[in-house]
Protein backbone atom coordinates (compact mmCIF):
# COMPACT_ATOMS: atom_id res chain seq x y z
CA UNK A 1 0.00 0.00 0.00
CA UNK A 2 2.85 2.41 0.73
CA UNK A 3 4.98 4.32 -1.77
CA UNK A 4 8.60 4.65 -0.81
CA UNK A 5 12.07 4.45 -2.31
CA UNK A 6 14.41 1.80 -0.99
CA UNK A 7 16.55 3.41 1.75
CA UNK A 8 19.68 1.81 0.35
CA UNK A 9 19.28 4.06 -2.66
CA UNK A 10 19.00 7.08 -0.39
CA UNK A 11 22.06 6.17 1.64
CA UNK A 12 24.13 5.57 -1.48
CA UNK A 13 23.26 9.00 -2.83
CA UNK A 14 23.74 10.56 0.57
CA UNK A 15 27.29 9.25 0.75
CA UNK A 16 28.16 11.06 -2.49
CA UNK A 17 27.49 14.51 -1.12
CA UNK A 18 28.17 14.48 2.61
CA UNK A 19 30.92 13.29 4.91
CA UNK A 20 31.06 9.61 5.90
CA UNK A 21 30.23 10.52 9.49
CA UNK A 22 26.84 11.80 8.36
CA UNK A 23 26.07 8.84 6.13
CA UNK A 24 25.30 6.34 8.89
CA UNK A 25 21.65 7.29 9.39
CA UNK A 26 18.75 8.48 7.31
CA UNK A 27 17.16 11.92 7.28
CA UNK A 28 13.69 10.35 7.31
CA UNK A 29 11.10 10.90 10.03
CA UNK A 30 8.16 8.50 10.17
CA UNK A 31 4.72 9.45 11.47
CA UNK A 32 1.70 7.16 11.70
CA UNK A 33 -2.02 7.60 12.38
CA UNK A 34 -5.12 5.49 12.96
CA UNK A 35 -8.72 6.70 13.27
CA UNK A 36 -9.65 10.23 12.12
CA UNK A 37 -8.47 12.84 12.53
CA UNK A 38 -5.09 11.25 13.11
CA UNK A 39 -5.00 9.99 9.54
CA UNK A 40 -6.33 13.16 7.92
CA UNK A 41 -4.05 15.53 9.84
CA UNK A 42 -0.95 13.96 8.26
CA UNK A 43 -2.33 13.29 4.79
CA UNK A 44 -0.08 15.81 3.02
CA UNK A 45 2.94 13.93 4.34
CA UNK A 46 1.95 10.71 2.57
CA UNK A 47 4.09 9.89 -0.47
CA UNK A 48 1.27 7.69 -1.80
CA UNK A 49 -0.61 9.68 -4.49
CA UNK A 50 -3.72 7.56 -3.96
CA UNK A 51 -3.92 8.91 -0.41
CA UNK A 52 -2.47 12.33 -1.12
CA UNK A 53 -3.40 13.50 -4.63
CA UNK A 54 -2.37 17.07 -3.79
CA UNK A 55 1.25 15.99 -3.55
CA UNK A 56 3.79 15.07 -0.91
CA UNK A 57 5.12 18.04 1.09
CA UNK A 58 7.54 16.04 3.21
CA UNK A 59 10.71 16.50 1.18
CA UNK A 60 13.16 18.62 3.20
CA UNK A 61 10.13 19.88 5.08
CA UNK A 62 10.34 23.62 5.81
CA UNK A 63 14.00 23.45 4.80
CA UNK A 64 14.79 21.75 8.10
CA UNK A 65 16.85 18.93 6.64
CA UNK A 66 14.43 16.02 7.09
CA UNK A 67 11.99 14.12 4.91
CA UNK A 68 8.67 13.41 6.64
CA UNK A 69 6.76 10.24 5.69
CA UNK A 70 3.24 9.50 6.92
CA UNK A 71 1.49 6.12 6.92
CA UNK A 72 -2.12 5.56 7.92
CA UNK A 73 -5.29 3.58 7.06
CA UNK A 74 -8.43 4.75 5.29
CA UNK A 75 -12.03 4.16 6.37
CA UNK A 76 -14.18 4.27 3.22
CA UNK A 77 -17.91 4.21 3.84
CA UNK A 78 -17.47 4.47 7.61
CA UNK A 79 -18.59 7.14 10.03
CA UNK A 80 -17.41 7.80 13.55
CA UNK A 81 -17.20 7.45 16.34
CA UNK A 82 -16.76 3.73 15.67
CA UNK A 83 -14.57 3.67 12.57
CA UNK A 84 -13.71 -0.02 12.56
CA UNK A 85 -10.64 -1.71 11.14
CA UNK A 86 -10.10 0.35 8.00
CA UNK A 87 -7.89 -0.64 5.10
CA UNK A 88 -4.36 -0.01 3.89
CA UNK A 89 -1.26 0.62 5.98
CA UNK A 90 -1.68 0.19 9.73
CA UNK A 91 -5.21 -1.14 9.78
CA UNK A 92 -6.69 -1.21 13.27
CA UNK A 93 -5.62 -4.81 13.68
CA UNK A 94 -2.76 -6.23 15.73
CA UNK A 95 -1.30 -8.60 13.16
CA UNK A 96 -1.62 -6.11 10.30
CA UNK A 97 -0.07 -3.31 12.35
CA UNK A 98 2.94 -5.38 13.38
CA UNK A 99 3.55 -6.74 9.88
CA UNK A 100 3.28 -3.25 8.38
CA UNK A 101 5.50 -1.84 11.09
CA UNK A 102 8.50 -4.03 10.42
CA UNK A 103 8.08 -3.82 6.65
CA UNK A 104 7.80 -0.04 6.52
CA UNK A 105 10.51 0.75 9.05
CA UNK A 106 12.92 -1.48 7.12
CA UNK A 107 12.29 0.73 4.07
CA UNK A 108 12.20 4.13 5.77
CA UNK A 109 15.02 3.60 8.31
CA UNK A 110 13.55 6.44 10.38
CA UNK A 111 15.87 8.60 12.44
CA UNK A 112 12.82 9.51 14.54
CA UNK A 113 9.23 8.30 14.92
CA UNK A 114 5.98 9.79 16.16
CA UNK A 115 2.93 7.54 16.32
CA UNK A 116 -0.55 9.02 16.78
CA UNK A 117 -3.98 7.67 17.62
CA UNK A 118 -7.37 8.91 18.72
CA UNK A 119 -7.69 9.65 22.41
CA UNK A 120 -10.35 10.88 24.82
CA UNK A 121 -13.59 12.64 23.90
CA UNK A 122 -12.10 16.10 24.41
CA UNK A 123 -9.66 18.69 23.04
CA UNK A 124 -6.51 17.02 24.30
CA UNK A 125 -2.97 16.62 22.98
CA UNK A 126 -1.80 13.81 25.24
CA UNK A 127 1.88 12.94 24.99
CA UNK A 128 2.44 9.44 26.34
CA UNK A 129 5.47 9.18 28.62
CA UNK A 130 5.76 5.43 28.14
CA UNK A 131 4.20 2.34 26.61
CA UNK A 132 3.86 -1.14 28.00
CA UNK A 133 4.84 -4.61 26.81
CA UNK A 134 1.43 -5.87 27.84
CA UNK A 135 0.35 -9.45 28.40
CA UNK A 136 -3.37 -8.70 27.92
CA UNK A 137 -5.08 -6.70 25.19
CA UNK A 138 -8.55 -5.57 24.15
CA UNK A 139 -9.71 -7.73 21.21
CA UNK A 140 -9.65 -6.17 17.74
CA UNK A 141 -12.10 -6.82 14.87
CA UNK A 142 -10.92 -10.04 13.22
CA UNK A 143 -9.42 -13.34 14.36
CA UNK A 144 -6.87 -13.71 15.78
CA UNK A 145 -8.25 -10.98 18.00
CA UNK A 146 -5.17 -10.37 20.15
CA UNK A 147 -1.43 -10.19 19.47
CA UNK A 148 1.45 -12.20 20.86
CA UNK A 149 1.47 -11.50 24.57
CA UNK A 150 3.75 -9.85 25.30
CA UNK A 151 4.57 -8.63 21.78
CA UNK A 152 8.25 -8.07 22.59
CA UNK A 153 9.91 -11.33 23.74
CA UNK A 154 13.18 -9.51 24.53
CA UNK A 155 11.71 -7.32 27.29
CA UNK A 156 10.06 -7.81 30.66
CA UNK A 157 6.38 -8.85 30.37
CA UNK A 158 4.23 -5.84 31.34
CA UNK A 159 7.39 -3.74 31.52
CA UNK A 160 7.42 -0.12 30.38
CA UNK A 161 9.61 1.49 27.76
CA UNK A 162 9.98 5.26 28.04
CA UNK A 163 9.29 7.80 25.32
CA UNK A 164 12.34 9.58 23.93
CA UNK A 165 10.34 12.45 22.43
CA UNK A 166 11.01 15.99 23.71
CA UNK A 167 7.77 15.69 25.64
CA UNK A 168 7.80 18.89 27.68
CA UNK A 169 8.95 20.96 24.69
CA UNK A 170 6.04 19.59 22.66
CA UNK A 171 3.54 20.33 25.41
CA UNK A 172 4.90 23.84 26.00
CA UNK A 173 4.88 24.75 22.30
CA UNK A 174 1.38 23.38 21.67
CA UNK A 175 0.09 25.32 24.66
CA UNK A 176 1.84 28.50 23.52
CA UNK A 177 0.24 28.27 20.06
CA UNK A 178 -3.18 29.12 21.47
CA UNK A 179 -4.99 26.31 19.67
CA UNK A 180 -7.43 25.62 22.49
CA UNK A 181 -5.85 22.26 23.22
CA UNK A 182 -5.21 20.72 26.60
CA UNK A 183 -1.64 19.57 26.01
CA UNK A 184 -0.08 17.43 28.73
CA UNK A 185 2.17 14.47 29.44
CA UNK A 186 0.43 11.29 30.54
CA UNK A 187 2.52 9.64 33.23
CA UNK A 188 -0.18 7.26 34.44
CA UNK A 189 0.34 3.54 34.99
CA UNK A 190 -2.27 2.88 32.29
CA UNK A 191 0.15 4.33 29.71
CA UNK A 192 -1.39 4.13 26.22
CA UNK A 193 -4.27 1.83 27.15
CA UNK A 194 -5.00 -1.75 26.13
CA UNK A 195 -5.77 -1.42 22.40
CA UNK A 196 -3.94 -0.48 19.22
CA UNK A 197 -2.75 2.87 20.55
CA UNK A 198 -0.60 1.14 23.13
CA UNK A 199 0.41 -1.51 20.64
CA UNK A 200 1.78 0.79 17.95
CA UNK A 201 3.19 3.14 20.56
CA UNK A 202 5.13 0.26 22.06
CA UNK A 203 6.36 -0.75 18.61
CA UNK A 204 7.83 2.73 18.21
CA UNK A 205 9.72 2.57 21.50
CA UNK A 206 10.78 -1.01 20.79
CA UNK A 207 12.15 -0.06 17.37
CA UNK A 208 14.04 2.91 18.79
CA UNK A 209 15.62 0.71 21.47
CA UNK A 210 16.84 -1.71 18.80
CA UNK A 211 18.41 1.12 16.80
CA UNK A 212 19.58 3.42 19.60
CA UNK A 213 23.29 2.96 18.91
CA UNK A 214 24.79 5.91 16.94
CA UNK A 215 26.93 3.38 15.06
CA UNK A 216 23.80 1.66 13.73
CA UNK A 217 23.18 2.56 10.08
CA UNK A 218 19.49 2.66 10.99
CA UNK A 219 20.15 4.88 14.02
CA UNK A 220 16.86 6.08 15.52
CA UNK A 221 17.23 8.99 17.92
CA UNK A 222 13.70 9.36 19.31
CA UNK A 223 10.26 7.77 19.31
CA UNK A 224 6.99 8.19 21.14
CA UNK A 225 3.21 8.29 20.98
CA UNK A 226 0.59 11.06 21.11
CA UNK A 227 -3.15 10.66 21.71
CA UNK A 228 -5.33 13.24 19.94
CA UNK A 229 -8.71 14.12 21.44
CA UNK A 230 -11.83 13.17 19.50
CA UNK A 231 -13.10 16.76 19.43
CA UNK A 232 -9.96 18.15 17.81
CA UNK A 233 -10.75 19.20 14.23
CA UNK A 234 -8.39 18.34 11.42
CA UNK A 235 -7.01 21.86 10.97
CA UNK A 236 -6.15 22.20 14.65
CA UNK A 237 -4.72 18.68 14.77
CA UNK A 238 -2.56 19.42 11.74
CA UNK A 239 -1.14 22.56 13.33
CA UNK A 240 -0.40 20.79 16.60
CA UNK A 241 1.23 17.90 14.76
CA UNK A 242 3.46 20.31 12.82
CA UNK A 243 4.43 22.05 16.07
CA UNK A 244 5.28 18.65 17.54
CA UNK A 245 7.35 17.78 14.48
CA UNK A 246 9.36 20.98 14.79
CA UNK A 247 10.19 20.17 18.39
CA UNK A 248 11.15 16.63 17.43
CA UNK A 249 13.43 17.91 14.67
CA UNK A 250 15.15 20.26 17.13
CA UNK A 251 15.81 17.26 19.37
CA UNK A 252 17.22 15.24 16.48
CA UNK A 253 19.32 18.21 15.32
CA UNK A 254 20.88 18.41 18.76
CA UNK A 255 21.93 14.77 18.46
CA UNK A 256 22.94 14.02 14.87
CA UNK A 257 25.34 15.67 12.39
CA UNK A 258 23.96 18.17 9.89
CA UNK A 259 24.00 16.89 6.27
CA UNK A 260 23.65 20.30 4.62
CA UNK A 261 20.99 21.28 2.10
CA UNK A 262 22.69 19.69 -0.90
CA UNK A 263 22.61 16.23 0.61
CA UNK A 264 18.98 16.49 1.61
CA UNK A 265 17.88 17.71 -1.81
CA UNK A 266 19.70 14.82 -3.46
CA UNK A 267 17.83 12.40 -1.21
CA UNK A 268 14.50 14.05 -1.85
CA UNK A 269 15.00 13.94 -5.60
CA UNK A 270 15.66 10.22 -5.53
CA UNK A 271 12.62 9.63 -3.33
CA UNK A 272 10.42 11.53 -5.76
CA UNK A 273 11.89 9.82 -8.80
CA UNK A 274 12.16 6.25 -7.56
CA UNK A 275 9.15 5.56 -5.38
CA UNK A 276 7.60 2.19 -5.86
CA UNK A 277 4.25 0.76 -4.90
CA UNK A 278 4.55 -2.00 -2.31
Where are these regions (language model features)?
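Bacterial N-terminal signal peptides
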Residues: 9-17
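Active-site-adjacent mobile loop/cap segments within catalytic or ligand-binding domains
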Residues: 192-253
